[in-house]
UniProtKB/Swiss-Prot annotation:
Entries under CDD domains matching the protein: BRCT_DNA_ligase_like, H3TH_FEN1-XPG-like, LIGANc
Function description: DNA ligase that catalyzes the formation of phosphodiester linkages between 5'-phosphoryl and 3'-hydroxyl groups in double-stranded DNA using NAD as a coenzyme and as the energy source for the reaction. It is essential for DNA replication and repair of damaged DNA.
GO molecular function: DNA binding; DNA ligase (NAD+) activity; metal ion binding
Gene3D superfamilies, sorted: 5' to 3' exonuclease, C-terminal subdomain, BRCT domain, DNA ligase/mRNA capping enzyme, Helix hairpin bin, Nucleic acid-binding proteins
The protein's name: DNA ligase
PROSITE patterns registered for this protein in UniProt: BRCT (PS50172), DNA_LIGASE_N2 (PS01056)
Species the sequence originates in: Clostridium botulinum (strain Okra / Type B1)
């Protein structure tokens, strides 16, 4: 038995190496026939021993059909990227980076290096996260999902022959990449497909979202990896170093990666990538520009959605011509009435487009858009269809688009404010009220569990809910009269509404629906002004002092709290028992408060993210590099060069046990 297992291990190692040479390097060292003979030998041994190694190539395609997708919590967050659509926006991003670095270097002895960027292609596929354990075995693969929780697609990813099932690595890592379908694979699949695929992106996404693993394998997907999102081993000092690590692990990587020291070089690389876009065997929709130095990334930090040290440059979208059939006017949460174009259905980038953005009447007149005319439609950022103009020859039999004078839902007279039309009937205009209630109850706002748009519509139509405050007046007996509301569901909603009364101030500010104010801005306002009363009475001059609040956002906030009706609604909410609170985090005295700490090596009781959170909760600053300003270096198993640097500089070194004793 032992001899057979050893032979199996030997065959698995050989076959995986041959697959890497064939699929990744495109340089096979043995013939297909020799490979097949070894593969067949492995299959026979697996049947005889009834043992299959988790990284065996026979695991790439299974006969099973999965029942459902399970959730997977990523060890490291998968961030989205901010986007630039032109060089002006890219230069603005670059200048913001320069400003932060100059400020940091003026106050710190440990200077940051001059900005250096790495430019890569932006692949148009599906983002995936692959987890390899301390033995180098692929144990989990997942979709991006929310960035924190994705769906387990391990079986599907194993069908991608370029993705190694085992790597030569001795610590847990998560590697981010893009699963794609090549044009060659797309054409081959469609030759025999009963339902041909429309585009490469759908081909890749559909394959990974398929519970029939054999069907996934038929799509013959590929992948490129470009980021280590979680790493329990030695930390990287630069993105270049990270990319070399990914390559050395045998993970497939695009050959194009360029280093730039200024925006002129970045622009040239973007132009080059766009020039070869049509020649590639896969789709790209832009370029990605990232800061190379890892410490600089840490100083630049993150917004609530994006890393500030990376940005995606989006290429011009595709355009096509179709007929404008009609215009539909819709009412938003703020009462703004906006036009949507109804189009003769047309295929654009593999998607059937039936509707498009028109923005407002000024936009319609400027573009000379008319009913019945042929219009140019663009999928901006390859996602949102927008009308860019008209075909002049088609205007002869077209009709003018008339601006509405009444609300399409409640028939109230509309008022014009600048380029927009508004319905001021906030009490009985269904779309306004329903969207306001849904926003107020959402998870990031008042977090009223079990609330939905369908529920909001019923509350408006059947219970005559005409304001946010009316939510807190609802009785259980009233809910029981609604469709699908039984005793338990009614009681649960009443409880959820009552529980929401005790909410943090930032969530309450966000729930109010102030124009241009998202959750991050709400948090920043609370951090600056501390109380609801202070926020209500602040000036525009004070508001622009808040990080990332410019004059437009400041005026939105100021005007919002100048509205007597809004102030009256807020007072009613407070009188009904809503108690928004703000608590400054208090940190007890401890040996690590206000200390700079560097962590190196693997800890027994903490992941890298957990120890960072723990240290920050103690009031410590966590740094990625050791300097004479470092107070402690916390050392785990297999420490890297930071340990040697600490000894060299005479920095205090502690192990995990000493750390635990100090915080008891």
């Amino acid at each position: 038995m032992d001899n057979k297992l050893e032979k199996m291990k030997e065959l698995v190692e050989e076959l995986n190496q041959y697959a890497y040479e064939y699929y990744v390097l495109d340089n096979p060292s043995i013939s297909d026939k020799e490979y097949d003979l070894k593969y067949d030998e492995l299959v026979i041994l697996e049947k005889k021993t009834e043992v299959t190694l988790p990284y065996s190539p026979t695991q790439r395609v299974g006969d099973k059909i999965l029942g459902e997708f399970s959730k997977y919590t990523h060890k490291g967050r998968l961030w989205s990227l901010d986007k630039a659509q032109n060089m002006e926006q890219l230069i603005e991003w670059h200048n913001r980076n320069l400003k932060v670095i100059e400020q940091y270097n003026s106050m710190s002895e440990d200077k940051l290096p001059e900005l250096r960027y790495i430019v890569t292609k932006k692949f148009d596929g599906l983002t995936v996260n692959c987890t390899y354990d301390e033995n180098g075995i692929l144990i989990k693969s997942a979709t991006r999902g929310t960035g924190i929780i994705g769906e387990d697609i391990t079986a599907q990813i194993k069908t991608i022959k370029t993705v190694p099932l085992k790597i030569k690595n001795s610590h847990v890592i998560e590697v981010h990449g893009e699963a794609i379908m090549t044009k060659t694979a797309f054409e081959e699949y469609n030759k025999a497909a009963q339902v041909p695929l429309k585009n490469l992106r759908n081909g890749a996404a559909g394959a990974l979202r398929n519970l029939d693993i054999k069907e996934t394998a038929r799509r013959n997907l590929s992948a490129f990896f470009y980021d280590v999102g979680y790493n329990e081993g030695p930390e990287f000092k630069s993105y270049r170093e990270m990319m070399n690590f990914i390559k050395n692990m045998g993970l497939p990587q695009d050959k194009y990666i360029k280093e730039c020291t200024n925006m002129e070089e970045v622009e040239k690389e973007i132009e080059y990538i766009e020039s070869i876009r049509g020649e590639l065997d896969y789709d790209i929709d832009g370029a990605v520009i990232v800061v190379d130095d890892i410490k600089t990334r840490e100083i630049l930090g993150y917004t609530i959605k994006f890393p500030k040290w990376a940005i995606a440059y989006k290429f011009e979208a595709k355009e096509i011509t179709t007929k404008l059939l009609d215009v539909e006017w819709n009412v938003g949460r703020s009462g703004r009435v906006t036009p949507t174009a109804l189009l003769e259905p047309v295929e654009l980038g593999g998607v059937t487009v039936k509707r498009a953005t028109l923005n407002n009447m000024d936009d319609i007149k400027r573009k000379n858009v008319k009913l019945g005319a042929k219009v140019l439609v663009r999928r901006s950022n390859d996602v949102i269809p927008e009308i860019m103009g008209v075909v002049e020859e088609s205007l002869e039999e077209s009709e003018e688009i008339q601006a509405p004078d009444r609300c399409p839902y409640c028939n109230s007279h509309l008022v014009q404010n600048g380029v927009h039309y508004y319905c001021e009937n906030t009490l009985s205009c269904k779309p306004q009220m329903v969207k306001s209630i849904v926003h107020f109850a959402s998870r990031e706002a008042m977090n009223i569990a079990g609330f939905s748009e369908k529920t909001a519509e019923q509350l408006f139509e059947k219970l005559d809910i005409k304001s946010i405050a009316d939510l807190y007046k609802i009785k259980k007996e009233e809910l029981l009269t609604l469709e699908k509301f039984k005793d338990k569901k009614s009681q649960n909603l009443i409880d959820a509404i009552q529980n929401s009364k005790n909410c943090d101030l930032a969530s309450f500010i966000y729930a109010l629906g102030i124009p241009n104010v998202g959750k991050k801005t709400a948090n920043d306002l609370v951090m600056k002004f501390k109380t609801l009363e202070s926020i209500k009475n602040t000036t525009i001059e004070q508001l622009v002092e808040v990080p990332d609040v410019g004059e437009i956002v400041a005026k939105s906030i100021y005007d919002f709290f100048e509205d007597e009706k809004i102030i009256s609604n807020i007072e009613e909410l407070l009188n009904l028992g809503v108690k928004p609170y703000y608590e400054e985090e208090r940190i007890d005295e401890n040996p690590f408060m206000d200390k700079t700490i560097v962590v190196t090596g693997s800890l027994n009781n903490y992941s890298r993210g957990e120890i960072k959170d723990k240290l920050q909760s103690l009031g410590a600053k966590v740094s990625s590099s050791v300097s004479k300003n470092t107070d402690y270096v916390l050392v785990g198993e297999k420490p890297g060069s930071k340990y040697e640097k600490a000894i060299e500089l005479g920095v205090k070194v502690i192990n995990e046990e000493e750390f635990s004793n100090k915080i008891k």
